[in-house]
Amino acid sequence: MKSDTLVTGLKKDKEIELTVTGRKSGKPLPRPVWFVLRETELLLLPVTGTNSQWYKNVLRNPHVKIRSSQQSFKGKLRAITERKQVDEVIELFKVKYGPSDIKKYYPNPNVAGSLQLN
């Protein structure tokens, strides 16, 4: 199953490429992002929260593409805005990347994103 292979590959990666569609240009905009996995759910944390350009683009068009070192996947990214759920994502990021890096690189983690991989 493709999602099993994707999840297995993602477990080895620290960074993926996220491609969103520009809300003004309509062009694909790839960028490297950190992520965490929760079973078959890929979770993202915009570096500057609601001010992140990729997050603003996703609000306009939630269809995204991710590319790992193993393969790529297209899906629909769901915005997570409820504080408790965002805090859960932040905690998962702290486990994977370390609390000091999350504090350093994520000054305003007030939203997150979820992409189902199955």
Functional labels for PLM-detected ranges:
Residues 3-7, 26-28, 35-40, 73-80:
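A broad, low-specificity signal for short, low-complexity segments enriched in glycine/proline
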Residues 6-8, 43-56:
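Covalent nucleotidyltransferase core used to form phosphodiester bonds in nucleic acids
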Residues 5, 20-25, 100-105:
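Short helix-to-loop capping/linker segments positioned immediately adjacent to catalytic or ligand/cofactor-binding
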Residues 10, 25-27, 58, 107:
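A generic structural micro-feature
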Residues 13-47, 64:
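Short beta-strand segments
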Residues 1-17:
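Extreme N-terminal tail/first-helix region
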Residues 49-118:
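Short, structured beta-strand-loop surface elements
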